Amino acid sequence: MTENSYKTPCGCIHYFVNIIDKQKITLVFLPGLTADHRLFEKQIEYFEKKQNVLVWDAPSHALSRPFTNNYSLSDMAEWLYEIIAKEEIYNPIIIGQSMGGYLAQMYMELYPDKIKGFISIDSAPLQKSYMTAVEIWLLERAEPLYKIYPWKVLLRAGSRGCAETDYGQNLMRKMMMSYDSDPEEYARLAGFGYRMLAEAIKADLPYHISCPALLICGEKDKAGSAKSYNKKWHQREGLPIKWIKNAGHNSNTDQPDE
C-alpha cells in the first residue's frame, strides 16, 4: 500500500492505495467516526494482492490532522470524489462502516453514476424519514456527554461498546489512543461528527441508493438503533442484508472471515 495525501482548505487528508489494474473494480474503505484506516486492516491484508484497494483516514482523524472542523458531509463526499478521480479509479465499490456508510450515501447523492456498488457495515440510512426528531436532537447535543466522562471510562466504554472480540476491542482502543494526549480533541471530534450527520439528515435529500448494495450488521451491535434501522432499511428498500453472528458495531473486526 502506498500512502498519499490530498490537500483541502481545511487540512490534508491521508490515504493508502494499491492499484493493480485501473479498469477493474476498486474497493474503497471508509472507516467510521473516531476510527481510522486500521479498522480495515484484516480486509486490506486479504484484498490488497487481489483487488485495487483504497482506505483513508477521514478528515480530522489519525494521520489526517491537524484539520479544521468546519466542513459538511457533502464536503467530505466531494473530497472523496476528487481523491478517487486523482487516483484514476473508474469503478469504485464503496464500503462504509458506520459514519463511512453515511458518507457513501452522500457520495451517491452527489455522484449517482460514479459508483459501482455500496456495502454498508453497521451503518444506517441517511433519509430523514427513518429518524425521530428526538434522535436528531440528541445527535446535535452529543459533545457535552463525551466531555463529562473521564478518558479512561470512555476508552473502556468505546472499545467494549464497539466490538465483542478481544481483537476488535483492542483495535478500537488502539485507534482511540490516537487522541490520548488530548482527550478533549476526541470529544470535539465525536460531537462535530454527530452534528454534521444531523445536518445531512435534516437536509432531507432523497439519498437514493443508485447501485447494487449490501447491508451488513453485527447481531450484537449496541450502537444507537443500528439494528433497528437496518431491519427497516432492508424491509423498505428491499436491500439484501447479512447479519454477522458474535459481532458488534465494528462487525468487520469481530468476524473478518465472514
Identify the meaning behind each predicted range.
Residues 1-12:
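N-terminal cap/lid segment of alpha/beta-hydrolase-fold proteins
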Residues 14-66:
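Conserved HGGG/HGGXW glycine-rich cap/lid loop of the alpha/beta-hydrolase fold
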Residues 42, 106-110:
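Active-site signature of alpha/beta-hydrolase-fold catalytic machinery across serine-
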Residues 54-95:
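Active-site loop/oxyanion-hole signature of alpha/beta-hydrolase fold enzymes
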Residues 96-100, 104:
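Gly/Ala-rich beta-loop-alpha elbow adjacent to hydrolase catalytic centers
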Residues 109, 116-148:
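Flexible "cap/lid" loop of the alpha/beta hydrolase fold
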Residues 129-131, 148-208:
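Conserved alpha/beta-hydrolase catalytic His-Asp/Glu region
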Residues 210-247, 253:
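Conserved loop-alpha-helix segment in the C-terminal half of the alpha/beta-hydrolase fold
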